[in-house]
Amino acid sequence: MGSLTTNIVLAVAVVAALVGGGSCGPPKVPPGPNITTNYNAPWLPARATWYGQPYGSGSTDNGGACGIKNVNLPPYNGMISCGNVPIFKDGRGCGSCYEVKCEQPAACSKQPVTVFITDMNYEPISAYHFDFSGKAFGAMACPGKETELRKAGIIDMQFRRVRCKYPGGQKVTFHVEKGSNPNYLAVLVKFVADDGDVIQMDLQEAGLPAWRPMKLSWGAIWRMDTATPLKAPFSIRVTTESGKSLIAKDVIPVNWMPDAIYVSNVQFY
């Protein structure tokens, strides 16, 4: 009889745990709707965290899930952030820009600063979640209060989408990824002004009129797989989220190499 009673108690406990979620951690918050190119949208609430070194640019390799490297250097200058699902958008949010600010705790300056999305973080702590580099998180603080703000760990914040601006003369830039060859071309795109993010890239081979759609590989990297060798130089058409397009004519030359950077002469201005 005692065994039966014990089994009943255990069964009730299991059901209660299932009904209650069976978890001691914080509740998981579903992601919000995707952020679009509505630049007149009001400020939205989010939660902010930070990672890496206190004054650093996030990842130890100065990169992230977009594939963009050296984010510690200009023009990013370490002012970068991971975005959750509706911000990162499986890589199609890479390069987009946001004004961010906080009002509490007291160390917050309440003044907006601009960050670039170069990484992802899917921790379900808020409908919108920015996981900043240490430098970017501290930039929301009053002067001299950066360390105090970082000690807060997780804070409430506000954000809004803004157009990306780069220093004068900065053009759309392409990096041919390691492992690329005449039958497999993988290209990272960066320094895209205005919308910042790219929703489609197309490639035109030398001497051919047709544009061939590239596939999003991961992050900000687009690829072309082909059974027949591609003929350089290559022109690349870049289309951003709002539907704007530009063409980088013959941007990847005849003697192109893997792991090489090619700077175009065009920009979304």
Swiss-Prot record:
| Pfam families reported in the protein's UniProt record | DPBB_1 (PF03330), Expansin_C (PF01357)
Q: Which residues cross the membrane?
A: none
The record describes its membrane topology as: Peripheral membrane protein
Show the InterPro entries listed in the entry.
Answer: Expan_Lol_pI (IPR007118), Expansin/allergen_DPBB_dom (IPR007112), Expansin_CBD (IPR007117), Expansin_CBD_sf (IPR036749), LolPI (IPR005795), RlpA-like_DPBB (IPR009009), RlpA-like_sf (IPR036908)
Glycosylated positions are 34
Q: Does the keyword Disulfide bond apply?
A: yes
What does the sequence similarity comment in the record state about its family? Belongs to the expansin family. Expansin B subfamily.
Q: What is this protein called?
A: Expansin-B9
Naturally occurring in which organism (per UniProt): Oryza sativa subsp. japonica (Rice)
* Name of encoding gene: EXPB9
